[in-house]
Amino acid sequence: MQIKREAVCGTLQSNDCLVRIVPSEKLELDLKSSVLNEFGAQIKKTVQEVLDEFEVKNAKLFIEDKGALDCTIKARVETALRRANEK
């Protein structure tokens, strides 16, 4: 999938995450989380699974997590990717 424009999904409320994606020359992830020490690796794995599913190679993702569950993170990343691919 080609990232065509910037897109945002989510909120900064408790148990949610805010995902912002922008076009980039390489794949980058900027993750901030209130539970980074405990679940940072799992969050990164979850995000990477969605990126692999959509075959994203060139994008920069900014994710600010407030304790979101994996299913919420997946949904937010997927929605941001779809929005970034719209014309």
UniProtKB/Swiss-Prot annotation:
Signal peptide positions on this chain: none
GO (cellular component) term, any one: cytoplasm
List of residues that carry O-(phosphoribosyl dephospho-coenzyme A)serine: 14
Domain of life: Bacteria
Chief location bin: cytoplasm
Database matches in InterPro entries: CitD, Mal_deCO2ase/Cit_lyase_ACP
Keyword Cytoplasm recorded: yes
Keyword NADP: no
Keywords, ordered alphabetically: Cytoplasm, Phosphoprotein
Function per UniProt: Covalent carrier of the coenzyme of citrate lyase.
Protein name (record): Citrate lyase acyl carrier protein
Native species: Treponema denticola (strain ATCC 35405 / DSM 14222 / CIP 103919 / JCM 8153 / KCTC 15104)
Name of the encoding gene: citD
